[in-house]
Amino acid sequence: LAGGRIAEPASYHLTESITRHGIIAGRMKTGTPVRIDGRSVHYELMETQDGENDFHRFSFMSEPRKLKQLQCWTCFTNEEVHEILRKGLPDSPLFNGQIQSIGPRYCPSIETKIVTFPDKPQHQLFLEPEGETTQELYLNGFSSSLPMDIQLAALKKVPAFKDLVVYRPGYAIEYDYFDPTQLKHTLESKIIKNLFLAGQVNGTTGYEEAGGQGIIAGINADINCHGGEPFTLGRDEAYIGVLIDDLVTKGVDEPYRMFTSRAEYRILLRQDDADMRLTERAYKLGLVK
């Protein structure tokens, strides 16, 4: 079934237009949790989690901007929830063969959790506001590709969700990525000049991973246009350097996520010395004044 993100069409022929030049493509999968109406939730039956007020910055050069912290909540699934989910597994694309690609190891769907850890009587769920001006909540920990009626029936067995209203169900998709070993350390393609690839399309997963690649690709795209030496970061300079070096030298066989354990210089790559490591390099590029 072709499709993009919810309510969006699939992107047809884009991959084919790239692979015909010799760039290798593969498939991975990802999923997203259900979005729920916060007005239908019994908050008194959950534990609260307050935001952090002790902010630590990476740089002293910009004015402090305190983001308003919103409260989150936690609760747990139970055996009744798991039993409904188990009965629905034949309808899950992740388990009936419709989706066969590899997904993020550290963001398993709720179906995967109950199958992989059948001895666990409960799994934690986190309710996260989607913004200051909406009642919509992101139900972290309940990523699913099951039909909506099964998702809703299972969730209603959680005491705090007995009157739950769902805005959008969780769902899973397969997507194309391109072999990152065909990229330079600048994230420019070795095959197509001036084509830069960054983010999930390189086989990574995660916001910071995508953002880190994006800034390096953007810097080097600008350098290609206006002239200058290619900009790269070493494994001893930044986690971005570790990430990109792993991608372009080792490649990926599952969605890649950055960990401190991947960095042999992790004692040097600290939050408290980020400004000393990177400010001078950013200044020479004109990124800071």
In which residue ranges do the predicted regions lie?
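Glycine-rich loop(s) and the adjacent beta-strand/alpha-helix scaffold that form part
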Residues: 1-36, 158-159, 163, 216-224
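Short, conserved loop/turn and helix-capping segments at secondary-structure boundaries
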Residues: 4-12, 144, 211-212, 234-237
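An anion/pyrophosphate-binding glycine-rich loop and adjacent beta-alpha core
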Residues: 16-152, 240, 244, 249-289
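Flexible, glycine/charged-enriched surface loops at secondary-structure junctions
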Residues: 28, 95-103, 161-169, 228-233
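Short, well-ordered loop/turn elements at secondary-structure boundaries
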Residues: 120-122, 160-161, 191-192, 211, ...
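A glycine-rich dinucleotide-binding beta-alpha-beta segment and adjacent secondary-structure elements
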Residues: 138-204, 232-245
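Glycine-rich phosphate/pyrophosphate-binding beta-alpha loops
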Residues: 200-208, 264-266
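Internal hydrophobic alpha-helix adjacent to the cofactor/substrate pocket in enzyme cavities
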Residues: 210-233
